[in-house]
């Protein structure tokens, strides 16, 4: 493991300019962490976040190390409870194991009911970004503030049928909006074409409100739609099956990132 430079107070920068620490124990000054994280969120580079839901669960450490060594920017982790969506994915022990070995940003997407009950738990597990579903929150603004109070960036996910206009009053409090481009619950689904229009609408809302919110796309992302998603306003592309089912996942990540930033 590379030792952090004293100049960066515990931050190790990857080739993709990831500012998050390899060992969270090195983090002594939260104000520096927050400032660096904010700089990262305002970067113009488009980001790739492999979805661990599509990884080989029987050889998970191998796939985590592959992402660590790749040009990926974030680890995207889908947490499902079998209630909000029909599938069940990761429990806390698995998430703890992932964050222990991951050396990149931990982007957690909660597809669960009553997400407020678990905000502190996910913060303690090392999550950098915590995204909750608009459809699962009874008081969205309060949930966002609770996430930020734990030192995480606050994201809001919306299902394919949810109207962008519902974020009008909270967009300035949201660090990231995740647009589901498939119906949530299972990996490997086909891409919903109306996603392009939703990204355009969301980008227009962000600009009109003067917000700095990132747009993340989750579901069915491949080399066939990545470029157009970026062109209409996306900042972060989540790719699961396209990466992990390929013959060379690391090369697939590299090519996807190059395509997104070309």
What kind of feature is each model-predicted range?
Residues 1-24:
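Positively charged N-terminal leader segments that act as targeting/secretion signals
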Residues 26-42:
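Short, Lys/Arg-enriched N-terminal segments with co-localized hydrophobic residues
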Residues 79, 110, 134, 158-160, ...:
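Short secondary-structure boundary segments
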Residues 128-212:
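Conserved anion-binding
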């Amino acid at each position: 493991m590379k030792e952090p430079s004293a100049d960066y107070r515990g931050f190790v920068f990857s080739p993709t300019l990831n500012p998050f620490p390899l060992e969270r124990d090195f983090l002594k000054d939260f104000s520096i962490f927050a400032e660096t994280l904010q700089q990262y969120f305002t970067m113009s580079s488009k980001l790739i976040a492999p979805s661990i839901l599509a990884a080989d669960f029987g050889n998970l450490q191998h796939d985590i190390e592959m992402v660590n060594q790749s040009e990926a920017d974030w680890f995207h982790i889908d947490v499902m409870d079998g209630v909000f969506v029909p599938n069940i994915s990761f429990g806390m022990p698995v998430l703890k194991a992932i964050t222990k070995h991951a050396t990149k940003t931990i982007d957690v997407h909660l597809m669960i009911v009553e997400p407020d009950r678990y905000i502190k738990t996910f913060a303690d597990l090392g999550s950098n970004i915590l995204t909750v579903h608009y459809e699962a929150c009874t008081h969205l603004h309060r949930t966002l503030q609770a996430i930020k109070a734990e030192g995480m960036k606050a994201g809001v996910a919306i299902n394919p049928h949810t109207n962008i206009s519902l974020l009008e009053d909270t967009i300035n409090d949201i660090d990231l909006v995740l647009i589901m481009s498939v119906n949530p619950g299972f990996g490997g689904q086909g891409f919903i074409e109306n996603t392009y229009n939703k990204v355009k609408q969301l980008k227009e809302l962000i600009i009109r409100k003067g917000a700095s919110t990132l747009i993340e796309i989750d579901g069915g992302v491949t080399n066939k739609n990545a470029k157009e998603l970026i062109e209409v306003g996306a900042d972060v592309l989540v790719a699961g099956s396209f990466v992990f089912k390929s013959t060379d996942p690391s090369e697939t990540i590299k090519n996807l990132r190059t395509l997104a930033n070309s």
